[in-house]
């Protein structure tokens, strides 16, 4: 915090991965008071953890507009030890953890701020981190499907490291377009493309599962965010596979940036990797 000059006392963080579960539940219509009383019992049927090991949150996304006496509820559950780990880092930095969100939802907040999406358009948000990729599929601004994949930018680094017998740091340098002694960036392009093919294959499997388990038959738009979004060749591989132009997420697309304080080139360089952070910054303490 001192290095970056962050002065805010309250911090929002996002969690994802195996310790986080998001489920859509279809329940009989009931009052908020009744739902508050029954949510723990309902949650036990959907999450693979002991109920006392998790923190729960939920939101009703449809109810009054349904004619079948049912309501849709989004349930988010995160293991307490995961939350404690993230919160502990904030506390160690002398700040207060005010909000713990789910990465997929923070990404959606940033999308709603920066992109206008028609109700009939199905959009896949893909956030590629170092070790985990978060996918949130939406119809308009309504979330339909979420999945975390245990793949990310480290797959590229590890492949380069293994193929060329390099250190992790040298492999990272090459992955990001640099060169190391005796090895040019051009020589690692085939490795990057091979990993991109594998990674995109996992994305497509997720899309096919979504289409097979929902009423939606197409993905109309794809926005790619995260620190790995701009890896050489990935955007083109994904574009070729899905048959339409994939977009790199711009977290500052609709945000006015003071160019006297922030270098526009730097802002552009970080615009895809800061999508989650921008989404978190929009959150209000509950």
PLM region spans:
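Phosphate-interacting basic helix/loop segments used at nucleotide- and nucleic-acid interfaces
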Residues: 1-5, 117-121, 202-210
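Small-residue (GG/TT-enriched) beta-loop-alpha framework at ligand/catalytic clefts
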Residues: 7, 13, 68-173
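Active-site neighborhood for divalent-cation/phosphate handling
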Residues: 14-114, 221, 251-257, 273-276
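Thr-Gly-centered strand-to-loop micro-motif
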Residues: 23, 145-147, 225
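Feature representing long, continuous alpha-helical segments
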Residues: 158, 194-197, 201, 205, ...
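Adenine-nucleotide phosphate-binding core of ATP-dependent small-molecule kinases
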Residues: 173-221, 228
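Glycine-rich phosphate-binding loops at beta-strand->alpha-helix junctions
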Residues: 195, 217-253
